[in-house]
Protein backbone atom coordinates (compact mmCIF):
# COMPACT_ATOMS: atom_id res chain seq x y z
CA UNK A 1 0.00 0.00 0.00
CA UNK A 2 1.40 3.42 -0.86
CA UNK A 3 0.38 6.75 0.55
CA UNK A 4 1.35 9.39 -2.07
CA UNK A 5 2.34 12.94 -1.21
CA UNK A 6 -0.01 15.79 -0.41
CA UNK A 7 0.53 19.46 -1.04
CA UNK A 8 3.85 20.84 0.29
CA UNK A 9 1.88 23.65 1.94
CA UNK A 10 0.31 21.04 4.20
CA UNK A 11 3.43 19.74 5.95
CA UNK A 12 1.52 18.49 9.02
CA UNK A 13 0.01 15.88 6.70
CA UNK A 14 3.41 14.25 6.27
CA UNK A 15 3.21 13.36 9.95
CA UNK A 16 -0.34 12.15 9.42
CA UNK A 17 0.85 9.87 6.57
CA UNK A 18 3.66 8.57 8.76
CA UNK A 19 1.22 7.87 11.59
CA UNK A 20 -1.16 6.02 9.24
CA UNK A 21 1.76 4.06 7.77
CA UNK A 22 2.88 3.04 11.28
CA UNK A 23 -0.66 1.88 12.12
CA UNK A 24 -0.88 -0.13 8.90
CA UNK A 25 2.56 -1.63 9.50
CA UNK A 26 1.45 -2.64 13.02
CA UNK A 27 -1.47 -4.47 11.38
CA UNK A 28 0.97 -6.40 9.19
CA UNK A 29 0.46 -4.32 6.04
CA UNK A 30 3.37 -2.74 4.21
CA UNK A 31 2.74 0.99 3.84
CA UNK A 32 5.01 3.43 2.05
CA UNK A 33 5.44 7.17 2.50
CA UNK A 34 7.15 8.52 -0.65
CA UNK A 35 9.31 11.13 1.11
CA UNK A 36 10.63 8.49 3.48
CA UNK A 37 10.68 5.34 1.37
CA UNK A 38 11.42 6.34 -2.23
CA UNK A 39 14.93 7.02 -3.51
CA UNK A 40 15.71 10.66 -4.21
CA UNK A 41 18.11 9.64 -7.01
CA UNK A 42 15.26 8.93 -9.43
CA UNK A 43 12.50 11.37 -10.38
CA UNK A 44 9.39 10.92 -8.23
CA UNK A 45 7.08 10.70 -11.27
CA UNK A 46 9.12 7.80 -12.68
CA UNK A 47 9.64 5.97 -9.41
CA UNK A 48 6.08 6.32 -8.10
CA UNK A 49 4.60 4.90 -11.28
CA UNK A 50 7.04 1.97 -11.30
CA UNK A 51 6.36 1.10 -7.67
CA UNK A 52 2.60 1.67 -7.69
CA UNK A 53 2.09 -0.47 -10.81
CA UNK A 54 3.70 -3.53 -9.21
CA UNK A 55 1.43 -6.53 -8.65
CA UNK A 56 2.29 -6.69 -4.95
CA UNK A 57 0.89 -3.17 -4.34
CA UNK A 58 -2.79 -3.66 -3.55
CA UNK A 59 -4.01 -0.16 -2.69
CA UNK A 60 -2.89 3.38 -3.45
CA UNK A 61 -4.40 6.21 -1.41
CA UNK A 62 -4.22 9.68 -2.97
CA UNK A 63 -5.33 12.71 -1.00
CA UNK A 64 -5.91 15.42 -3.58
CA UNK A 65 -5.25 18.84 -2.08
CA UNK A 66 -3.28 20.63 -4.79
CA UNK A 67 -3.19 20.86 -8.56
CA UNK A 68 0.04 18.85 -8.54
CA UNK A 69 -1.64 15.96 -6.76
CA UNK A 70 -4.70 16.35 -9.01
CA UNK A 71 -2.35 15.96 -11.99
CA UNK A 72 -0.76 12.92 -10.37
CA UNK A 73 -4.22 11.44 -9.81
CA UNK A 74 -5.09 12.07 -13.48
CA UNK A 75 -1.96 10.19 -14.56
CA UNK A 76 -2.61 7.29 -12.18
CA UNK A 77 -6.27 7.11 -13.25
CA UNK A 78 -5.29 6.55 -16.88
CA UNK A 79 -2.75 3.84 -16.05
CA UNK A 80 -4.66 0.52 -15.98
CA UNK A 81 -1.98 -1.03 -13.74
CA UNK A 82 -2.71 1.58 -11.05
CA UNK A 83 -6.27 2.84 -11.60
CA UNK A 84 -8.15 -0.04 -9.98
CA UNK A 85 -5.92 0.25 -6.88
CA UNK A 86 -6.62 3.97 -6.41
CA UNK A 87 -8.59 5.16 -3.41
CA UNK A 88 -9.09 8.89 -3.81
CA UNK A 89 -9.62 11.08 -0.74
CA UNK A 90 -11.09 14.52 -1.45
CA UNK A 91 -12.56 17.44 0.44
CA UNK A 92 -16.39 17.35 0.45
CA UNK A 93 -16.39 20.59 -1.58
CA UNK A 94 -14.79 18.74 -4.49
CA UNK A 95 -16.57 15.40 -4.27
CA UNK A 96 -18.83 14.82 -7.29
CA UNK A 97 -21.73 13.62 -5.13
CA UNK A 98 -21.54 16.21 -2.37
CA UNK A 99 -21.03 19.42 -4.34
CA UNK A 100 -23.70 20.53 -6.81
CA UNK A 101 -21.33 22.90 -8.65
CA UNK A 102 -19.59 21.81 -11.83
CA UNK A 103 -15.86 22.18 -12.10
CA UNK A 104 -12.64 20.61 -13.27
CA UNK A 105 -12.03 18.54 -10.14
CA UNK A 106 -15.57 17.19 -10.08
CA UNK A 107 -15.21 16.25 -13.74
CA UNK A 108 -11.86 14.59 -12.99
CA UNK A 109 -13.22 12.49 -10.11
CA UNK A 110 -16.53 11.44 -11.66
CA UNK A 111 -15.07 9.05 -14.29
CA UNK A 112 -12.99 7.34 -11.60
CA UNK A 113 -16.03 7.06 -9.37
CA UNK A 114 -18.11 5.66 -12.24
CA UNK A 115 -15.44 3.19 -13.38
CA UNK A 116 -14.03 2.05 -10.03
CA UNK A 117 -16.25 3.43 -7.25
CA UNK A 118 -13.47 4.75 -5.04
CA UNK A 119 -13.68 8.49 -4.41
CA UNK A 120 -14.27 9.32 -0.76
CA UNK A 121 -15.21 12.63 0.85
CA UNK A 122 -13.07 13.11 3.96
CA UNK A 123 -12.53 15.79 6.57
CA UNK A 124 -14.15 14.82 9.82
CA UNK A 125 -16.89 16.87 11.32
CA UNK A 126 -18.25 18.66 8.27
CA UNK A 127 -21.82 18.20 7.15
CA UNK A 128 -22.08 17.46 3.44
CA UNK A 129 -24.89 17.29 0.92
CA UNK A 130 -26.04 13.74 0.20
CA UNK A 131 -27.59 13.00 -3.21
CA UNK A 132 -30.92 11.26 -3.61
CA UNK A 133 -30.90 7.68 -4.89
CA UNK A 134 -32.42 8.84 -8.15
CA UNK A 135 -29.88 11.60 -8.79
CA UNK A 136 -26.99 9.29 -7.85
CA UNK A 137 -28.14 6.52 -10.18
CA UNK A 138 -28.71 8.97 -13.05
CA UNK A 139 -25.36 10.69 -12.53
CA UNK A 140 -23.35 7.47 -12.31
CA UNK A 141 -25.20 5.74 -15.18
CA UNK A 142 -24.68 8.71 -17.51
CA UNK A 143 -20.98 9.02 -16.71
CA UNK A 144 -20.52 5.25 -17.09
CA UNK A 145 -22.19 5.43 -20.52
CA UNK A 146 -19.87 8.29 -21.52
CA UNK A 147 -16.83 6.32 -20.38
CA UNK A 148 -17.97 3.18 -22.16
CA UNK A 149 -18.25 5.14 -25.41
CA UNK A 150 -15.14 7.28 -25.18
CA UNK A 151 -12.75 5.30 -22.94
CA UNK A 152 -13.84 1.65 -22.95
CA UNK A 153 -10.46 0.56 -21.58
CA UNK A 154 -11.43 2.13 -18.22
CA UNK A 155 -14.49 -0.09 -17.88
CA UNK A 156 -13.62 -3.53 -16.59
Regions found by a protein language model. Name each.
Residues 1-156:
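Conserved catalytic or regulatory cores that recognize and/or transform ribose-phosphate-containing ligands
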Amino acid sequence: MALPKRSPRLRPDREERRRVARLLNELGMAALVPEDDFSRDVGASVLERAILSRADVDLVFVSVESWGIATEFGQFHTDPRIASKLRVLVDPEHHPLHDPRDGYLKDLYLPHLAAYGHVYAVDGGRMVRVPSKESLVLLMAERYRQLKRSQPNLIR
